[in-house]
Regions:
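Short amphipathic beta-strand/extended segments with alternating polar/hydrophobic composition
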Residues: 14-23, 113-120, 198-207, 232-235
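Polar/acidic, low-complexity leader/linker segments enriched in S/T/G and N/D
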Residues: 1-43
Length: 272
């Protein structure tokens, strides 16, 4: 799948700052391109059985695609190909990173979408012996792109039930970032239940000195503003899960006074 936009932003830097624009060298003939990672099927087939022994399927392969950046039209009209100093500047921008960076494509239907990726296999694009651009491989951290952060903010006096819709393409659970703030008074109990499953996330007897809580639900990391240890107040009287959302509508009940702020970067299957 190709992009029709002419500009991209990687690690906060636009390709236009490098005097480059996005190019698509494919022809105009009809074609079909994959836009979703393949399903990995785990199964065995044995003689005498027409059905497989099916163990499950998973989408694990990261999303990968190739991009091309070439000199802008103004530079081409001036007949100024890229020199070695231009190439080293581009290489320093795109490659050698030790962690995933955000990539955004500037086009109308991708304003809220971005990729978390690394760039490799950087190659010069040559025409008539001159270097006019670069091509490279984009490797994402998952099979998906991501919507920009969406914040769901709830003020709870005692208990509140609401519907939170997951926009995720992933056919499984999504784990958000969660902040619990503004609780005052004496010891506090907090409970978050998702009626999509028979489990809950519960604190019992949190001291008022604990302060605000920040919870990375995906990695199971809880930090408090006071520096006190919040893990000792977790309750396992019911099946326990860090807050998580299934695809589609989720009915969430929050019990315990305070402000609950969920931050979600929904994974979406839009290809590359």
């Amino acid at each position: 799948m190709s992009f029709y936009g002419t500009s991209m932003i990687f690690d906060g830097v636009s390709c236009e700052e490098m005097g480059l624009v996005m190019y698509d060298f494919t022809s105009n003939r009809q074609s079909a391109t994959a836009f979703a990672s393949d399903l990995e099927i785990a199964e065995d087939r044995i003689d005498g059985r027409y059905r497989s022994l099916f163990y499950g399927g998973a989408v694990n392969a990261p999303l990968t695609f190739t991009m091309v950046l070439c000199a802008s039209e103004d530079r081409a009209e001036r007949n100024e190909p890229l020199d070695r100093w231009d190439l080293q500047k581009i290489a320093a921008w795109l490659t050698g990173h030790r962690e995933y960076k955000w990539l955004s494509i500037v086009q109308e239907d991708m304003e809220e979408i971005r990729y978390r990726c690394l760039i490799s296999d950087l190659q010069a694009v040559e025409v008539a012996g001159n270097k006019w651009g670069v091509s490279f491989q984009v490797t994402c951290d998952s099979p998906y792109a991501y919507l920009r952060p969406m914040v769901y903010d709830y003020m709870v006096a005692s208990s509140l039930t609401t519907t939170l819709r997951s926009e995720s393409s992933h056919n499984g659970f999504y784990y958000p970032k969660l902040a619990i703030t503004g609780h005052t008074g004496g010891d506090l109990s907090i409970r978050i239940e998702n009626r999509m499953e028979a489990s809950s996330f519960t604190f019992q007897g949190l001291p008022s000195a604990m302060g605000d809580l920040t919870i990375d639900c995906e990695n199971g990391v809880i930090t408090s503003a006071s520096g006190l240890n919040p893990y000792q107040y977790l309750s396992y009287d019911t099946p326990f899960h860090f807050p998580r959302f299934a695809r589609g509508d989720n009915t969430i009940t929050m019990t315990g006074s305070g402000r609950y702020t969920f931050t979600c970067e929904w994974p979406v299957n839009v290809g590359g």
